[in-house]
Amino acid sequence: MENYIKIKDKFIIADPKDNVATARVEVKADTVLMTDDGSKIIIKELIPFGHKVALKDENRDEGVIKYGQRIGIATKDIAVGELVHVKNLSGERGMAK
């Protein structure tokens, strides 16, 4: 049996609509997390403290949601458990809609 860690022990999920979570602590690759609905997320790469992880697969040009608000768009496909940062996210702050 695998050892699971509750996702809320390692990450902050601010709103049920969020498709990213923020790391409370540094989280190593291959960490297995259990979500509230019983599904598991395997962390794909090191997630530094304060950085975001994808809670579901995101397609290129799809909105990234944090605090229940769209904070940017995916610039390439993002897999669940992957770091969400400038390498795959474009912020929309200050951009005309």
Regions found by a protein language model. Name each.
Residues 1-66, 70-97:
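Well-ordered secondary-structure scaffolds
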